[in-house]
Every structure is written in C-alpha cells, then in structure tokens.
Amino acid sequence: MGNYSTNISDNQWQFIKKSLDLGNRKRKYSLRMIWNAIMYLVKTGCQWRMLPNDFPKWQLVYYYYCKWANAEDFDLLLSKLRDKERLKRCQNMEPSLGIIDSQSVRWGNNRSLNGYDGNKKVKGIKRHVVVDKNGFLLTVMVTVANVYDGKAVELLMKTLFYFLIPVKVILADGGYRGEIIEQIKNKFGYLIKVVMRNDDKKTAFVPVSMRWVVERTFSWFDNDRRLCRNYELLMENAENMVKLSAIKLLLNKI
C-alpha cells in the first residue's frame, strides 16, 4: 500500500468504523483501503479508472462509494464528525445558526448538465450550501449554474429539514430576498436573515460579519482538485464529492 498523504490514520479509521458500524468481517481488500482510495481521488481529482495500482480495483472502490452514498452513510459520518468537533470547541452539538450561499463552478465534463451564471460569468454548475458558524457543512445541493439562489433555497431547506438539523436562524446575502423568506419560515420554521454590505463607507475591504465563514468553506473545497471543476455526470455525485471533501477536512481534526 502506497504511503500517500491522504491515507487515513489509525484513529481516523477507528472513528469511521465505529460511526458506520463496519464490523470486522474478513475481506480480500480491507474497507480502510477503500476509504484511502476515495480520499486520494477527492484530493487529487483523478478519474476512477486512473486510481493507482496500490489501491483495490477501481470497480470495487466505486461499488463501495455507491453503496455508502445510497445508504446515506456519508451524511451520517459527516454529522458525527461535525458533532465531535463542535463538542471539542465547547459548543452545542446541534447548531442553531446557519449561513447559506452558493458557488458557481466551471464544468469539466461535456456530457454533464450545465447552465450559465450571468452574474459570475461561469458556465457549469452551482453548489448551494448551508454551513454552521465554524464553516462546517450542514447540507449541500447542486444545480445547473443558471438556477437563481432564491429558487433553489426551498429545496435546500427541504434537505436541511430532512436531516433534522435544528437551525433557527440562517444568514444570507441579497440573493435570498423576497417572499421566499416568509414561505421558508411558514413551511420549515427557519428564519432567513439577509445581511447586506454597508456600501456607504468607502473604506478598505471589510468582510461581512459571519457571512465570510461560508466563503472560507468554498476556499476549503478548492483545496481538493476534484471540486475545482465539476467532472461529475450526475448531480448526486457532485453533492457526494462535496460531502467527502467536508468529511476529509473534519477527519484531519481528529
């Protein structure tokens, strides 16, 4: 087995194994090797078929990736890692504050669905995310880039509600103004608070209070080459890669 920097440590593997109840059944290839392969792919951005020979066959790695994704194991692991880190920081395990924003990403696969974001001048997809006050991912939804933030927010809130995340207030930018705020409050109980930049003061750049946290999360995503462009044919896979990037970030804090 190659000694890659993305390989999972003993402590990290014990946490994954316990969180997902993977057991100790003997296999030809250990599940730890499968996880190492997935982390390598997310970090380097290589194709499934281009995984090094140090790892199990790519078909087997992809099989487990699909199995865990369909079973929502990535969501479960992300939740447990986030809870662990919040407790470590002496914070409540369940976040009450969220920050919402979107990131337009250029497409890298001619067969994938894509749109054109006229604001950012980007042709590709758009990642809609909600993070907690630390910048840790709560939920993600991927659409084509021409979907307006205000139109995507209801489906994003539906996903947040599905995972029973008890957020009370969600900070947003001006793209989420309008009737949708009242609709979200009535339907899901989330209060979306629009925080705008004060343009009256012509001074040096000052980050908008708390909202800068989600921008930092987007910069964390860009550290993983798989997320620098969208190479996924399916939107679900694009969402899973974001979750895996967030998992990798939190695993490194163990």
State where each predicted segment sits.
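Short alpha-helical elements
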Residues: 1-254
